[in-house]
Amino acid sequence: MPELPEVETVRRGLEKLLLGRTILSLEVKVPKMIKTSYDSFLHDLPGQTIQAMRRRGKYLIFDFGQLIIISHLRMEGKYLLFTDQVPDNKHFHLFFKLDDGSTLVYQDVRKFGTFDLLDRKQEEAYFTRKELGPEPTKKTFKYVPFERALMHSGKSIKPLLLEQKLVAGLGNIYVDEVLWAAKVHPETPANKLSKAAMKRVHDQTIAILQLGIAKGGSTIRTYRNALGEDGTMQNYLQVYGKTGQPCPRCASMIVKIKLGGRGTHLCPHCQKR
């Protein structure tokens, strides 16, 4: 699943390609992906001009001024822009014909992606309902509320971080990297962490997600940015996908366990419970 760095990289690519473009027509082959009114999606979007490409957590936001589309890529979603004829592909599900003759296509092998067409005034309430935490920046992700939330939760730290309520954007790849960098075992109950460990988790969340953005995201399986390019963050991962390899910090073997149904990578020496 694309995590925050991948979605931000897609956003930046789409921004370069789409700002100022007007939707002339659209086709939806998988109506279940449209989570708001299907008829409104078909009838209200033609004539709308893309004024901004924004992001909130793992959600992409196409901003038309009064209207917005909130798009979630889920497991395998990606956007492709074709300047002339669109090739046949059974995994192409949404087609946006643009005023310069190009076509923006949404591709999704799993068909899990979602689209919500909303009035911009509904955006804040939408993300409030999702209980989405702050963006992982020094300005928005404050330590004191984070510490307070950890102290009041007995959940294992990894599943807790993946809920998106404490901070937006972490997924399976980056949470493993954050906890390794913070020397915290993923199964540790949040309220059992020392305050020093809580601070390390907080600071490494910001640092590693920002590094992921700088490196254009991680291309592990199928991820590409909006320009069709691979990310490079996979070259900087320390534990994710490194089972049986030496820990970069202590040379112990990286192991993989199951936690909350997810494969979880850690160093048993550096990340003691």
From Swiss-Prot:
What is the name listed in the Swiss-Prot or TrEMBL entry for this protein? Formamidopyrimidine-DNA glycosylase
Q: Which PROSITE patterns match?
A: FPG_CAT (PS51068), ZF_FPG_1 (PS01242), ZF_FPG_2 (PS51066)
Could you give the cofactor binding note from the entry? Binds 1 zinc ion per subunit.
- Which catalysed reactions does the entry list for this protein? Hydrolysis of DNA containing ring-opened 7-methylguanine residues, releasing 2,6-diamino-4-hydroxy-5-(N-methyl)formamidopyrimidine; 2'-deoxyribonucleotide-(2'-deoxyribose 5'-phosphate)-2'-deoxyribonucleotide-DNA = a 3'-end 2'-deoxyribonucleotide-(2,3-dehydro-2,3-deoxyribose 5'-phosphate)-DNA + a 5'-end 5'-phospho-2'-deoxyribonucleoside-DNA + H(+)
GO BP of this protein: base-excision repair
Q: What is the lineage of its organism?
A: Bacteria, Bacillati, Bacillota, Bacilli, Lactobacillales
Q: How does it assemble?
A: Monomer.
Look up the EC number in the record and give it. 3.2.2.23, 4.2.99.18
Q: Zn finger regions (FPG-type) covering which residues? A: 238-272
What keyword terms does UniProt attach to this protein?
Answer: DNA damage, DNA repair, DNA-binding, Glycosidase, Hydrolase, Lyase, Metal-binding, Multifunctional enzyme, Zinc, Zinc-finger
Q: What does this protein do?
A: Involved in base excision repair of DNA damaged by oxidation or by mutagenic agents. Acts as a DNA glycosylase that recognizes and removes damaged bases. Has a preference for oxidized purines, such as 7,8-dihydro-8-oxoguanine (8-oxoG). Has AP (apurinic/apyrimidinic) lyase activity and introduces nicks in the DNA strand. Cleaves the DNA backbone by beta-delta elimination to generate a single-strand break at the site of the removed base with both 3'- and 5'-phosphates.
Q: Which InterPro entries does the protein's record reference?
A: DNA_glyclase/AP_lyase_DNA-bd (IPR015886), DNA_glyclase_Znf_dom_DNA_BS (IPR015887), Formamido-pyr_DNA_Glyclase (IPR020629), FPG_cat (IPR012319), MutM-like_N-ter (IPR035937), Ribosomal_uS13-like_H2TH (IPR010979), Znf_DNA_glyclase/AP_lyase (IPR000214), Znf_FPG/IleRS (IPR010663)
